[in-house]
Amino acid sequence: MEEMEEELKCPVCGSFYREPIILPCSHNLCQACARNILVQTPESESPQSHRAAGSGVSDYDYLDLDKMSLYSEADSGYGSYGGFASAPTTPCQKSPNGVRVFPPAMPPPATHLSPALAPVPRNSCITCPQCHRSLILDDRGLRGFPKNRVLEGVIDRYQQSKAAALKCQLCEKAPKEATVMCEQCDVFYCDPCRLRCHPPRGPLAKHRLVPPAQGRVSRRLSPRKVSTCTDHELENHSMYCVQCKMPVCYQCLEEGKHSSHEVKALGAMWKLHKSQLSQALNGLSDRAKEAKEFLVQLRNMVQQIQENSVEFEACLVAQCDALIDALNRRKAQLLARVNKEHEHKLKVVRDQISHCTVKLRQTTGLMEYCLEVIKENDPSGFLQISDALIRRVHLTEDQWGKGTLTPRMTTDFDLSLDNSPLLQSIHQLDFVQVKASSPVPATPILQLEECCTHNNSATLSWKQPPLSTVPADGYILELDDGNGGQFREVYVGKETMCTVDGLHFNSTYNARVKAFNKTGVSPYSKTLVLQTSEVAWFAFDPGSAHSDIILSNDNLTVTCSSYDDRVVLGKTGFSKGIHYWELTVDRYDNHPDPAFGVARMDVMKDVMLGKDDKAWAMYVDNNRSWFMHNNSHTNRTEGGITKGATIGVLLDLNRKNLTFFINDEQQGPIAFDNVEGLFFPAVSLNRNVQVTLHTGLPVPDFYSSRASIA
């Protein structure tokens, strides 16, 4: 019953209703509280005064509207309009519910009479503090409102069940504890109110005062007062007016405004309304049960939210820590590359210092020797050696020619860390708000007519289905490893076309694509099978070649402008399969030593191929050849090259070896074993040599047969 307590309290005083009356809006008020919130309209602001003054529309025109509609709402004399607006010259105050309250015309009489029986000022109205609807009172004042005897009985039973102390019914502010009850007045008094309102003299001297507990018992045992008609106070209700929805007496039916209305027996309507209320309560009870279950669900959600929050925070911290760890690992890798570049630069500079020191010492020795020879006075002896000395001086001078006195390495580090994409990604790092109402994109469609392969590159194109209405934020393209292995992402972005380079030759790849948005990812498209070229077609790469290299014939023919060896690489790199290419010698003067083989992308370009650890090569003159890697010369083999000779290079990455051929004959044994990684075809030569590259060649038959036998 504790939840019912708010229903039993007056909205004005906040205490249990005392002598509650029913307003036309069906809300209840204490009689004393209703008296306190009466609003008196001054004569100067009455509608008649405004009309007499000839003024225009005012705030009190609402009163006219209500008086014109006194009988429009079931003859109740009840109208709806807003609160009054105060005039500058009229003293007033605002109550919390926005009702305008004027000072009473005279102080309330300090008598023993109930406040409801005191005279009501003229032009009074009352505003319901709950729905704020207003009513102009007639001559009966508050006596025109029926008393809610049922509510009184409910309050009595509730207070008895709570065994609460009885309160005085006449205290104007916070009611004090009652000390007596008058059986005749049926009112509980505290001592101050009893002395003020119920003095023991005159007619009141014959009243019997009893303790509050005894009075409560006698009140409960005494029959409840029967509700009387508000229009005929001496008559009890006997019938029920269906049109006005209120009990009426027989005089109302014979003489009053209900004479022409449909009426029914009071007992029958009492039972009918009780039945209707019970049925309505059943529905409300079901709703209350659902509300309790919903509250349990909400309380469980609070606990679940707490647990999910802790779990999500832990997951977020773990993800951020993983990003930090990955960044630290990448930092270590980049620092290792910087250190490697540092060591490489120092090695190159030190090697050049050593080389120049030796050559300078030789040059200085030759100069000193020539000066001493010039000092000799023996003409015949001088002429015997002068020609050779002159040639040596010119040759030495040529050796100090172009490029020799140029540093092979710059002091600057040609490395620039582009961290802007990562910073942008960090700034864009945010939570993805998944909306259940937003579906995932439709499955993309691969456009077969636009998909193709060239050499070891594949171009794929896709589109959204024509009738798709869900936009895609981007696409994810996946390829397997060419051996039927797991798929891996090769492109993520908004474009609908992508070219993938660096695939293996003579390999079969499977490709698929899916779309994504903030809600999730679509299913994969159908898998597309791609076949790369069986053999490689490529040319020399001018972008990575030394500046002294001269290319022609669509970058298939190469020579050099320097007497020193310079390196040029092919455009295509290999990391898998068997590959064969040839080079024909177009020009060969003064017996130089060109070198042929494979190299990494960062091989030294200003020395013979094989001088560093980034190249694997065979260098050859007109009589013999050598294999060279990391400046180590091995396997001298007889047989050289001349103009028109053909050099073949066979890179078998399946067996991880490199073999050379001259004029279709294998030159020496297998040159290098255990070669793996990414390799580019490479050549080093000087100005005395010109060669032409031939690609797209099948593996020699004899090698294929030997490989199949093995």
UniProtKB/Swiss-Prot annotation:
A Pfam family matched in the record: zf-B_box
InterPro entries found in the cross-reference section: B30.2/SPRY (IPR001870), B30.2/SPRY_sf (IPR043136), Bbox_C (IPR003649), ConA-like_dom_sf (IPR013320), COS_domain (IPR017903), E3_ligase_FN3/SPRY (IPR050617), FN3_dom (IPR003961), FN3_sf (IPR036116)
Keyword Plastid applies: no
GO biological process: proteasome-mediated ubiquitin-dependent protein catabolic process; protein ubiquitination
Zn-finger (RING-type) residues: 10-50
Phosphothreonine sites (modified residues): T41
Compartment(s) where it occurs, according to its Swiss-Prot or TrEMBL record: Cytoplasm; Cell projection, Dendrite; Cytoplasmic vesicle, Secretory vesicle, Synaptic vesicle; Synapse
Glycoprotein found in the keyword field: no
Renumbered zinc finger spans (B box-type): 163-212, 224-266
SUPFAM superfamilies: B-box zinc-binding domain, Concanavalin A-like lectins/glucanases, Fibronectin type III, RING/U-box
Binding site for Zn(2+) 1: C168, C171, C193, H198
Coiled-coil spans in chain: 273-340
Residues of the COS domain: 374-432
Occurrences of domain B30.2/SPRY (ranges): 533-702
Family (UniProt): Belongs to the TRIM/RBCC family.
Function: E3 ubiquitin-protein ligase which ubiquitinates itself in cooperation with an E2 enzyme UBE2D2/UBC4 and serves as a targeting signal for proteasomal degradation. May play a role in regulation of neuronal functions and may also participate in the formation or breakdown of abnormal inclusions in neurodegenerative disorders. May act as a regulator of synaptic vesicle exocytosis by controlling the availability of SNAP25 for the SNARE complex formation.
Official protein name in the record: E3 ubiquitin-protein ligase TRIM9
Organism, scientific name: Homo sapiens (Human)
Gene coding for it: TRIM9
